[in-house]
Amino acid sequence: EGKDGFLQSYAPSPDISRAAANLGTVWETMNIAVKPYPSCRYSHSAMGAIAAMRSKNNISIEDVEKVEVGLPHTGWRIIGETDESKRKPTGAVDGQFSMPFCGAVVLREGTMGWDDYDKHLNDNDTLALAAKFTTVTDPWAESEYPDNMAGIVRIKTSRESFEHSVTVPKGEPENFMTDAEARSKFDDLVAPYLSE
């Protein structure tokens, strides 16, 4: 560990002795999040809210008029500021940091996996849906930050409006993925490379 080492990069006052403290008795990996979606973590609460509303309300994509996503300000700056790269990402990395794109994929598919970038980056229907998204700094989400990367989503359709918020995104220790969800993510990631 030097002045530009790993600990110096991530901790204001690193104490290397803490790395081995309670070794073998405290399992810190049980205190870390496992992301269910292949996108920026700031998008996950909103993606979970969209998936929940889609599942519960049988929302038809054709009926969607507009979608508003509320995030903490820091998240909004990273994935929500409205510019062309957020509405029409040109590659997977742009897509990972685009709330409109990730939200549109989840609204269409019910979830999002790694292969959805290839499937949706040039899909006119997905991009048209992403164009209906507006991302804002939300006072409630901001009040939850930095303890939680909360998100709230409002979907207006031609027949009615829906709203759902998620305080703790799926994958956090307090809202960990089920074994089935973790297995599904694993299968999604390895399927292109492993035979049955």
Positions of PLM-derived features:
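Terminal-appendage/accessory-domain detector
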Residues: 1-196
